[in-house]
Regions:
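Conserved donor-binding/catalytic core segment of Leloir-type glycosyltransferases
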Residues: 139, 182-201, 207-210, 224
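A charged, aromatic-enriched C-terminal amphipathic alpha-helix characteristic of glycosyltransferases
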Residues: 328-359
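Short hydrophobic beta-strand element within catalytic cores of glycosyltransferases
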Residues: 291-294
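Membrane-proximal helix-turn-helix segments that form the acceptor-binding/catalytic region
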Residues: 113-139, 145-147, 151
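Nucleotide-activated donor-binding/catalytic signature segment of Leloir-type glycosyltransferases, i.e.
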Residues: 236-256
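Conserved acidic donor-binding segment of nucleotide-sugar-dependent glycosyltransferases
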Residues: 306-317, 324-328
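Short alpha-helical donor nucleotide-sugar binding micro-motif in glycosyltransferases
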Residues: 252-253, 260-265
Length: 359
């Protein structure tokens, strides 16, 4: 039995889950989740026979005893330790452990300062020990997560480097969802941003870049911002001060409507600073045939976008140049192996190679 274990049924995990179920058979695969899905994923509970809540009968035993466990979005350290002690194959997909704690001016406050907290330090020490076992495999989501996990190991092994390879990971998409299209050579440029409105998402950069283009005479650029959050009122005021007619705010919508909006727009921007461990909406936008631009600091854009389509977080002028130069541009190419089908094949190969040895 193969189990995928996450905090909830997520649109970011479903493509991989479906591919694993197709290869293993529904009778040999379970997607176990902690909380009820939201945001357009609720129907999955009824449609997919291989999903189950963690508090359902038999779920706890399944997580303890399944041949292969792939966990993400949570850190069930005790479960991992019990499985590894029995030699059961356990894989852990993770975003950043050491996201910056904030910024002092333009300089990030090192996230490794979290290790000063006794509880966080104890947890990190336990994970560093888990990484010694051939029954435990880390799957870092994005380049910064890989760096963080290597740092966790070094901190508790007297500076020694982690010898085994970490397997780079991500949130994978189903291929072929959208027909090939280009950004229009003339007419309106429609820019889209989707997510939770938090300060480190740097949505202000996108607002300012669009305003800069319009102030410079390009009146055919518009921006749609989809989502809610504590920054919404501030961003609405900012957009209004900078010529709000070009910016439309849309409340949070379900994943089906997000995909529709992606097909209705031309350009997607991931503007986050280094606090963003990944940024799954970027890969979804690329799947829908959008031209995508993203920051050097966000995990998804660092992993998926070529350098000419990236900019430094907060660099309004650079983003404005990218948007202005997008007319006639082809969609951002998805790396050929970055599909759910390819990820499922790699996952099963990784699990097959792992050594199930009790510790």
């Amino acid at each position: 039995m193969f189990a995928l274990y996450t905090n909830t049924v997520s649109a970011h995990q479903l493509p991989l889950a479906r591919e694993l179920a197709a290869r293993l058979g529904a009778e040999n695969f379970r997607y176990v989740y902690e909380t009820e899905p939201t945001g357009g994923n609720q129907e999955t509970r009824e449609r997919e026979p291989w999903t189950m809540r963690a508090d359902e009968s038999g779920a706890a035993e399944l997580l303890e005893d399944c041949e292969v466990l792939l966990a993400g979005g949570l850190r069930p350290t005790g479960l991992f330790e019990r499985r590894v002690a029995r030699g059961l194959k356990t894989l852990y997909q993770t975003e950043r452990w050491f996201k910056p704690l904030g910024y002092l001016g333009s300089s990030p406050v090192p996230g490794s300062l979290r290790l000063l907290h006794p509880g966080y330090r104890r947890m990190a020490r336990r994970f560093a020990r888990l990484m010694e076992s051939p029954s435990f495999q880390v799957l870092p989501i994005g380049p910064w997560a890989e760096r963080d996990m290597k740092e966790v190991f070094r901190r508790f092994h007297a500076g020694a480097e982690f010898a085994r390879a970490l397997v780079p990971w991500g949130y994978y998409v189903a291929p072929g969802a959208a027909a090939a299209r280009r950004v229009p050579s003339d007419g309106e440029l429609k820019v889209l941003w989707v997510g939770r409105l938090l300060d480190w998402k740097r949505v202000d950069t996108v607002i300012d870049a669009v305003a800069k283009l319009r102030a410079g005479g390009d009146g055919l650029v518009s921006l749609t911002i989809v989502g809610d959050g504590p920054e919404k009122a501030r961003l609405e005021r900012r957009a209004s001060r900078r010529g709000g007619a070009a910016v439309r705010f849309v409340p949070r919508v379900d994943i089906r409507r997000v995909r529709e909006l992606m097909r209705e727009h031309d350009i997607y921007v991931l503007a986050s600073n280094a606090v963003e461990g990944w940024g799954a909406a970027l890969s979804e936008a690329m799947e829908e045939g959008m031209v995508a631009f993203g920051t050097e600091e966000a995990g998804a854009s660092a992993a998926l976008l070529p350098e000419p389509r990236r900019f430094r977080s907060g660099d309004v002028a650079a983003l404005a140049r990218l948007i202005a130069g997008a007319r006639g541009m082809a969609p951002s190419p998805m790396p050929p192996d970055f599909t759910a089908a390819g990820a499922a094949e790699r996952m099963l190969a990784v699990a097959e190679r792992m050594k199930g040895e009790p510790r």
